[in-house]
Amino acid sequence: MIRVGDLVKYAQENNLPAIAITDHGVMYSAVEFYELAEHAGINPLIGCEFYVNSGDIHVKDSANNPLYHLILIAKDNKGYKNLIKLVSTAWCEGFYYKPRINFELLKEYHEGLICASACLGGEVLQHLLKNEYDQAKEVAKRYQDLFGDDYYIELQDHNMDEQKRTNPDLMKIAK
């Protein structure tokens, strides 16, 4: 894990015009990150990696409500306020081992947000790992229908067999 100051320094040294930070389930580093990036002349993109379940966030049942990762990044003030609302709701109403949101909350608070399918823990990837291509495509379509052009399929290459196996399918889904 990288420290905020080191991330901003790396961005400066590599002439990156913008960088994002997406803590898991929280936004603890958002203010420090914003201030350091702004001071360095870098566009700070504030986000969060959420834990999303498919059921009611008030139900405390992890066996029937698997958690998936989902990246949300604020693209404007409305998006930032919606990030805060989602994080607060996840902690105050949806907490069960982890702060959770669901698709119903996303429908209510999606404005001003950019959405990415996330890592191997994301719902699209989890279906692909189980060889459920059609379900993965359906999930991606549901998010694209909600976020429109602000929904992105995330490709990662950390030299992991799972990513090597699923990235070609992710590229097909992204088209």
What are these regions (language model features)?
Residues 1-175:
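Phosphodiester-processing cores and adjacent nucleic acid-binding clamps
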